[in-house]
Swiss-Prot record:
Name of the molecule in the record: Alpha-conotoxin-like Ms20.2
Reported tissue expression: Expressed by the venom duct.
Complex formation: Hetero-, homo- or pseudo-homodimer (identical sequence, different post-translational modifications).
GO CC annotation: extracellular region; host cell postsynaptic membrane
Post-translational modification 4-hydroxyproline, affected residues: 54
Keyword list, A-Z: Acetylcholine receptor inhibiting toxin, Disulfide bond, Gamma-carboxyglutamic acid, Hydroxylation, Ion channel impairing toxin, Neurotoxin, Postsynaptic neurotoxin, Secreted, Signal, Toxin
Function text: Alpha-conotoxins act on postsynaptic membranes, they bind to the nicotinic acetylcholine receptors (nAChR) and thus inhibit them. Through its two C-terminal domains, this homodimeric protein would bind to two nAChR allosteric sites, located outside the nAChR C-loop of the principal binding face and at the adjacent binding interface in a clockwise direction. This toxin specifically blocks mammalian neuronal nAChR of the alpha-7/CHRNA7, alpha-3-beta-2/CHRNA3-CHRNB2 and alpha-4-beta-2/CHRNA4-CHRNB2 subtypes.
Annotated source species: Conus mustelinus
Propeptide residue interval(s): 25-45
Length: 93
């Protein structure tokens, strides 16, 4: 019974190393690219950001799974996850 309990504890704790508290992938994780592609499919794609804090690179308006509470400062940009580089803005031309 002790082995089963220990195995359950390990299985519950192990995923915590792959994700931070916000549900976002920890940078440098080998699984991050697949999760980023999953989050960008269909209706899970991030919504357009609105300027919240002029003059700063991030505001607090994009409450999506991918960018958490971060948002791009420019209008028309979207918050994206770049494999091995983390979260950033994708802005039109």
């Amino acid at each position: 019974m002790l082995k089963l309990e220990m195995m359950l504890v390990v299985l519950l704790i192990l995923p915590l190393f792959y994700f931070d508290a916000g549900g976002q992938v920890v940078q440098g994780d080998w699984r991050s690219d697949g999760l980023a592609r999953y989050l960008q499919r269909g209706d899970r794609d991030v919504r357009e950001c609105n300027i919240n804090t002029p003059g700063s690179s991030w505001g607090k308006c994009c409450l999506t799974r991918m960018c958490g509470t971060m948002c791009c400062a420019r209008s028309g940009c979207t918050c994206v996850y770049h494999w091995r580089r983390g979260h950033g803005c994708s802005c039109p031309g």
